[in-house]
Amino acid sequence: MKQFKVVPTIQEFETCKDFADTYGIGKGDLVFVSNGTKNHLFPELDNSGAIVVNYRNYGSGEPTDLIVEGICKDLEGKTYNRVFSIGGGTILDVAKLFALKTVSPVVKLFNKELEIVKDKELILVPTTCGTGSEVTNISILELTAINSKFGLAVDELYPDKAILIPELLAGLPMKYFATSSIDALIHSIESFTSPKGNDFTRMFSLNAMDMILKGYQEIAKNGEEARKPILRQFMLASTYAGIAFGNAGCAAVHAMSYPLGAKYHVPHGEANYAIFTEVYKTYMKLQPVGIINKLNNHLAGILGCGEDEVYTEIEKLLNHIIPKKALHEYGMTQEDIADFTETVMTKQTRLMNNNYTELTAETVTEIYKSLF
């Protein structure tokens, strides 16, 4: 059986003020937002009566179980009915957990050893153009005990509202624009080739690919500032890709990037890009006939090349956005290859089940070696 659903109501606002006026955030609300975003765009939060959490007070980089436990401790005894999160994917993923009745112990929650009950309204507002988290039922944390990222995917994590405000992308530095939008591109591609994909998910995948790659071509031709007039295009593409992978899932690219990102603190989109094309070249060697042919045909049309050249040409285009690095440039060692492979094969089965074709441990090892 194939299925497709979009749970959150998606709303778009012209400005942050329009959003704030509509929702009237105040007493009884929990708001996750960085100091920079709050001070610049939502200064009224300081005197609103809402509980305001600056995620960065609890740690830097990608979210961990320890960060969530720290926030839980500080929220003990405080009550709230609505959870707002205004930020990138890390902040959105953390905030989702606080719409649940019980969050701690976090490791038990992620292992599904706790009863999972949602008892608060959840409103997510992305400030980047990559996560897609605003429309998915997935929260990703680094679990420090296994030194890798791990996902919890349950319907209780679906937001009630996904709020799109293109104004929020205006101040996003090129570096963060690059890593987040590449993540969205890979969401669209992995969901397209997933066995769980269907005509509905692939419609969203293809639209996201078109919008992102054509935007990249504009940037490659005219420079970084060319992104400014098309920021709404990238925000929509990110949400389209989120709808696609929220239904069809991501796969080996994400699974293989997680240990790299967790151990060496590589930004999520950049870690995905480091792995991406080699996985798809491997798919083509193992199973050259299938849905991947439709993907290659579509990409060839956008890139203006032959189907046998798409992964070379897409890499050339992406290198205008963020240069690709070898894995050792992030600090990865030869010894990590075996450890990362074991983590992928034993801890990331949720993702590996969505591969276009089966990848064995030996194949995963070879991909890491070729990228080292």
Regions found by a protein language model. Give the residues of each.
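Acidic-aromatic/histidine active-site loop/patch
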Residues: 89
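Active-site segments that bind and position negatively charged phosphate/pyrophosphate groups
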Residues: 191-316
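C-terminal charged capping/lid subdomain of soluble metabolic enzymes
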Residues: 156, 298-372
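Structural motif
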Residues: 29-31, 81-84, 121-123, 160-162, ...
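Short glycine-/acidic-enriched loop or helix-start segments at secondary-structure transitions
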Residues: 41-43, 94-96, 134-135, 173
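ATP/NTP phosphate-donor binding region
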Residues: 1-82, 327
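DPxDG-like acidic metal-binding loop motif
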Residues: 93-104
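A glycine/threonine-rich phosphate-anchoring loop and its flanking beta-alpha core
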Residues: 103-199, 290-294
